[in-house]
Amino acid sequence: MPQVDPELFDRSQFQAELALKASPIAAYKKAIRQARQVLDERFRAGRDIRRLIEDRAWFVDQILRSAWSRFDWDKGADIALVAVGGYGRGELHPYSDIDLLILLDENDQEIFREPIEGFLTLLWDIGLEVGQAVRSVAECADEARADLTVITNLMESRTIAGPERLRQAMLQVTSTQQMWPSKEFFLAKRNEQRARHAKYNNTEYNLEPNVKGSPGGLRDIQTILWIARREFGTLNLQAMVDQGFITEGEHSLLTAAQEFLWKVRYGLHMLAGRAEDRLLFDHQRSLAALLGYEDSDAKLAIERFMQKYYRVVMSIAELSDLVGQHFAEVILWEGESGPIVPLNSRFQVRDGYLEVSNPAIFKRTPFAILETFVLLAQHPDIQGVRSDTIRLLRDHRYLIDDTFRQDLRNTSLFIELFKCKEGIHRNLRRMNRYGILGRYLPEFGHIVGQMQHDLFHIYTVDAHTLNVIKYLRKLTKPGVAEKYPLASKLVEKLPKPELIYIAGLYHDIAKGRGGDHSELGAVDAEQFCRRHKLPAWDTRLVVWLVENHLVMSTTAQRKDLSDPQVINDFAQRVGDETHLDYLYVLTVADINATNPTLWNSWRASLLRQLYTETKRALKRGLENPLGREEQIRQTQRAALDDLVRHGTDPDDAEQLWAQLGDDYFLRHTATDVAWHTDAIIEHPANGGPLVLIKETTQREFEGGTQIFIYAPDQHDFFAVTVAAMDQLNLNIHDARILTSSSQFTLDTYIVLEADGSPIGNNPERIEEIRSGLIAALRNPDDYLTIIQRRVPRQLKHFAFPPQVTIHNDTQRPQTILEIIAPDRPGLLARVGQLFLDFDLSVQNAKIATLGERVEDVFFVTDADNQPLSDPQLCLRLQQAIIKELQQENEQQPSPSSIVI
């Protein structure tokens, strides 16, 4: 810390201003304000961050000493002002808490009550954010013995004012001889760290990470230092080098990482104007600019900054693991080593952890680097890797070069890992953590820490990729059949499971390069397969999976699965059941690994329907596609059998069906047709709208909640319905809109609750929805008002210009209107109102919400039930939708198109 820094704090000028004023508050506030400005300017100018946070602590020292001196403490009184915690370390960020301990020799607070209260009041009045405790030395011992946080804070302390002997006495009564011996302290800190990591989903890669608390954050570095200080009296990272706990290279890496995170935290405090350790979307772009990042052709500044952040915290997490393992060996197991169990001439197991039998193993036999992870997978009872071996792995990464990558022993070992029954994900993740995976597969190294600046992908590309592997493994485990019934069944019958893991590893490998990542990734996948000597059929399958990994999800979510042509086209692309099985399993894993909230019951049912229909088409033969008439006959025959079995007169059913039209039977299953038919026949002719809600009691995880509405057609039907559903807090995931020849509407909506769950068998909720929709259709004017809801904070930071594309359907007499826009509350209700304004009827709709964006497709006709033919009308419609969905502060809309 500086001894004198007149620019930051001019003591003589400050004293002069104190003397001039009746109240000291203004002088203190002025000094604090000026110091903040000076330090912020130094930060912007690129001043060394370590010096900055030490300078801030030094400045606060001066203010506190001055404030302390204004009160009447008897000279030599048994009271001291002590800095603890981060401030005790001499580190202060702009709005960090200033943690103080007012330390007494005896429990005689009454003697000092008045000056203590006056001192603390002054600190609050001048605007210092202070956390304070008033304790005697004995009380410190009692509190520290009971509370891990207290003992940790007291370990990092400095005397600001008063006798130093009190702090020394406090340190004596809280030493390892008195409480928290090193083993107990280590275990408590390790459990504390694990609980903290769990709070942040055990990943360094959260979209809005906490710079301090997330895995790989500043708290992990502090945890290392706390344990070292408690056990060995080590005061800082350099001392850990001197004592042999870390190497010079690791010290340099940790120091650079710590200083980077300090810069991030300092900048966050500046931008937020308060204590803020969360790297929120609100600040990421501004912080990237503040730290000097600029856009390039390949990446935005924010993406470059966040990739740097993720790589830094990953390196901290890696070293935290290494040092933590070393501490465990030294603190927990010293003198308790069990027998050594040899695995082969290169590796052995000691105390449940893998280690090399000789420090020169990797140098002599480089293939042992990959063998490490294969052995861990083959012996799942091994708990991990000993710290010395982790360090040796890190130190010998340089051996992984092109020669290493082409060596048959290494390529064989890497493929062997994918054939293991256990531990594939765990050990690929270890390889990534230790920096091995990105060295062996340079194309993987490029995606490490690469963010995707949206809410759809909540992980970096490498984390998502490894999550895909995790979900692929999860599908093989007992207990997942309820949530993934089809995928868990299919994964068991894949002829070569290792191929789907390789496809999962490569499916997003080309993200961030520009161009179609599926096509570019397929090229990389083919090179991988050839280098690893995979057979030709295996290679073709892996390459096909990478190139087509998005096709099944986009088909299921954006196309009409009731259209036989859609199924036939998809079946043609898939070709056979083996490819279909592999693609379905990969798609399920990919969706779950992208964002756990994406896997809802509706997406599950769409994929299952596409799989089932495609499998049926493949069994029938691609040269014999199912025609419309045949599909309609099959559906009617099955539905009629069901109805007759339950007592419905077949003549009544066929009389109703004659009014419904072919599309109705193409878009609904036989079960749904029977359900609708029975209810319509029983419904009184003048009974008003019929609203049916299908309970989803049997499959908690499958199928969205289906709402069927049968009522006399009216022009505002769609607009009223979607507005009412919005007011009922329902998310619409699919809409099938039909009108019978008798001018009755038969509309089916697939909905989920706002949190993505099906409505299930909640009778009260079902009745609330049913009665709400009936009321809306009876009194439409009361429901067309759109509720104005606040746009969620996260969505505001992912605004992009809406895109509206209008073109006529080549297969059917209708116009296809596609909208890609930022998600916002009530969006579908707003679109429905515009359709009403333009006198449009909605024939069908596919609704998809992907993170912060919606990708909706509407099939519409004009008032005469014809496709739109007036280009000027289409242009006005397009402009109206864009204007309605345009958010304030957006750029100009992206180019949209009209093809009539």
From Swiss-Prot:
Keywords: Hydrolase, Magnesium, Multifunctional enzyme, Nitrogen fixation, Nucleotidyltransferase, Repeat, Transferase. Uridylyltransferase (UTase) activity is inhibited by glutamine, while glutamine activates uridylyl-removing (UR) activity. Its EC number is 2.7.7.59, 3.1.4.-. Residues 706-789, 816-896 form the ACT domain. Pfam families: ACT, GlnD_UR_UTase, HD, NTP_transf_2. Belongs to the GlnD family. Its cofactor is Mg(2+). Disulfide bonds: none annotated. GO terms for biological process: nitrogen fixation; regulation of nitrogen utilization. Modifies, by uridylylation and deuridylylation, the PII regulatory proteins (GlnB and homologs), in response to the nitrogen status of the cell that GlnD senses through the glutamine level. Under low glutamine levels, catalyzes the conversion of the PII proteins and UTP to PII-UMP and PPi, while under higher glutamine levels, GlnD hydrolyzes PII-UMP to PII and UMP (deuridylylation). Thus, controls uridylylation state and activity of the PII proteins, and plays an important role in the regulation of nitrogen fixation and metabolism. Coiled coil: none annotated. Gene3D superfamilies: Beta Polymerase, domain 2, cca-adding enzyme, domain 2, Nucleotidyltransferases domain 2. PROSITE patterns: ACT, HD. Residues 461-583 form the HD domain. CDD domains: ACT_ACR-UUR-like_2 (cd04899), ACT_UUR-like_1 (cd04900), HDc (cd00077), NT_GlnE_GlnD_like (cd05401). SUPFAM superfamilies: ACT-like, HD-domain/PDEase-like, Nucleotidyltransferase, Nucleotidyltransferase substrate binding subunit/domain. GO terms for molecular function: [protein-PII] uridylyltransferase activity; phosphoric diester hydrolase activity. This is Bifunctional uridylyltransferase/uridylyl-removing enzyme. Residues 343-705 are annotated as: Uridylyl-removing. It catalyses: [protein-PII]-L-tyrosine + UTP = [protein-PII]-uridylyl-L-tyrosine + diphosphate; [protein-PII]-uridylyl-L-tyrosine + H2O = [protein-PII]-L-tyrosine + UMP + H(+). Residues 1-342 are annotated as: Uridylyltransferase. Has four distinct domains: an N-terminal nucleotidyltransferase (NT) domain responsible for UTase activity, a central HD domain that encodes UR activity, and two C-terminal ACT domains that seem to have a role in glutamine sensing. Signal peptide: none annotated.
